[in-house]
Amino acid sequence: MTQLAIGKPTPLGAHYDGQGVNFTLFSAHAERVELCVFDANGQEHRYDLPGHSGDIWHGYLPDARPGLRYGYRVHGPWQPAEGHRFNPAKLLIDPCARQIDGEFKDNPLLHAGHNEPDYRDNASIAPKCVVVVDHYDWEDDAPPRTPWGSTIIYEAHVKGLTYLHPEIPVEIRGTYKALGHPVMINYLKQLGITALELLPVAQFASEPRLQRMGLSNYWGYNPVAMFALHPAYACSPETALDEFRDAIKALHKAGIEVILDIVLNHSAELDLDGPLFSLRGIDNRSYYWIREDGDYHNWTGCGNTLNLSHPAVVDYASACLRYWVETCHVDGFRFDLAAVMGRTPEFRQDAPLFTAIQNCPVLSQVKLIAEPWDIAPGGYQVGNFPPLFAEWNDHFRDAARRFWLHYDLPLGVFAGRFAASSDVFKRNDRLPSAAINLVTAHDGFTLRDCVCFNHKHNEANGEENRDGTNNNYSNNHGKEGLGGTLDLVERRRDSIHALLTTLLLSQGTPMLLAGDEHGHSQHGNNNAYCQDNQLTWLDWSQASSGLTAFTAALIHLRKRIPALMENRWWEEGDGNVRWLNRYAQPLSTDEWQNGPKQLQILLSDRFLIAINATLEVTEIVLPAGEWHAIPPFAGEDNPVITAVWQGPAHGLCVFQR
């Protein structure tokens, strides 16, 4: 039997050098680590890792080749009260594995035990890691490096974006390959998108609870192997990495960046009753935030929380991020529940992971976007992230919906959100682009559902409609559900136009949810994380070409307005913005606080957004000059106007002089 050489303690993971494979694994509390390799017949061969440098266990297997399947058995104490849950009867995934063979099914053998260890061996059914070798021709690929001030983000799901697209070949729909297909790239270019933000593509598992209900985790926020691509999105699991990189290369050639939604806050091992896949059995005490009683701090709502203040976990997370940038050429990250990244356990801007990213010559150069909260006390941290980060701006989302759909927002608050929420983000030398403005996202109602439903309808999720937020700030315009009279359809259309205009012509970085530009509906489900079906797949055959054209025209218009593209904070008297009332006069203090919902926003001294968010048709006196409506508002109903615009109820128009 081949003997393991001591090998090297770096880098983490399994790495082929042309002669064999070096294996390394971190565990500060293990007493012994076995490397388990499996031959073509599934026969297991075990080797003790002979090297032990600090907290890194390592060994070198001569003559091992790419394609080798492996896992680990980690020996140590079973002391739940102290946070130790070692169980060598369970085969464990390498946290740095780049490919996984097998499925993460709901099976009792994939659990370690709660109070007492489960000593039944699970190697026969446990997923295995696969050694891979990386050879890829990037040709002349270069990151677009779109300036933040010019960035337009499009949030999409790999499968849902193309699975029903009639112009994409059937055999690649819903895959990484489809992202790089000319039809999809041309669509994104014509729409005006500069960055495609993908929901998680790192390998994830469906929660046992969902599997028992016949559902699956669709969004992917349940990671199990952070260095491995989710194989279900590949035409062939063996070529997933190349398929993904082919798509990125094609998108880059078109000038479109790729941003990955990444989950560094928890793992698919869930709570103490959850499955044992990897980290819990390798070094539970180090990888997770552990309470005094040995249970997990559940600051994520998912059962566990990664301890990103531990030096080894910081190294792991940093290596993961560098891998996606260096190996896959991604252009940035959106961090799910990103407040966890700054926990020490209190949130700090100089937390270890933030510092590591700041000091990294690779990671400090890519786009970084935070979902700036978690569910722990002090978890709402909007505006408090380090300067390198942009942040999801939920202030903008709620203000836009309240202004146009609930009619209960003062003009002053609306204007503040329109101006990149400077009260929140204008600090620590940050720019307006730090505010990622959104009206909708994957989590919540789609834009169409915002104007068709007053209440969530999540019954299909199997939780008796208890899941999902009740704070939607939506308005069904008098009838719950899709369809209705022509008048109802038109009023809903006008509200959609108003919300899109507010999003795409405001200061900050706009993020558009895929499908909103052609009227996609989830039939009132505002938490469709477990709906891998026609509820979430974009139906291109039913897309509204008129709404798509309207959205594209708005994005094109945005790119013509210097005040929105220069990424500088607006200052009084700088010519970037003037706020006027219906008579083209500066608003008084009382009008800002209590005035009617009528407003004129003059941008760069020649683009005018006239707003009438009241229930009545209202005359709006335009500033001096000859004004004409511009696309997407130009038409027979909007000729050249020199003095007054008849503003329809809940309407707006954009003019140029």
UniProtKB/Swiss-Prot annotation:
Q: Which domain of life is it from?
A: Bacteria
The keyword Cell membrane belongs to this UniProt entry's keyword annotation = no
Is Hydrolase among the key words of this record?
yes
E.C. numbers: 3.2.1.196
- What Gene Ontology biological process does one annotation of this record name? glycogen catabolic process
Q: Which UniProt keywords apply?
A: Carbohydrate metabolism, Glycogen metabolism, Glycosidase, Hydrolase
Q: Which reaction does it catalyse?
A: Hydrolysis of (1->6)-alpha-D-glucosidic linkages to branches with degrees of polymerization of three or four glucose residues in limit dextrin
| Pathway linked to the protein | Glycan degradation; glycogen degradation
Q: Which Gene3D superfamilies match?
A: Glycosidases, Golgi alpha-mannosidase II, Immunoglobulins
Instruction: Give the region (Disordered) as residue ranges.
Output: 460-479
The entry lists its GO molecular-function terms as:
glycogen debranching enzyme activity; hydrolase activity, hydrolyzing O-glycosyl compounds
Active site (catalytic residues): D336 (nucleophile), E371 (proton donor)
Site (Transition state stabilizer): residue numbering on this chain: D443
The UniProt entry's sequence similarity note says: Belongs to the glycosyl hydrolase 13 family.
> What does the record give as the function of this protein?
Removes maltotriose and maltotetraose chains that are attached by 1,6-alpha-linkage to the limit dextrin main chain, generating a debranched limit dextrin.
Recorded protein name is Glycogen debranching enzyme
* Underlying gene: glgX
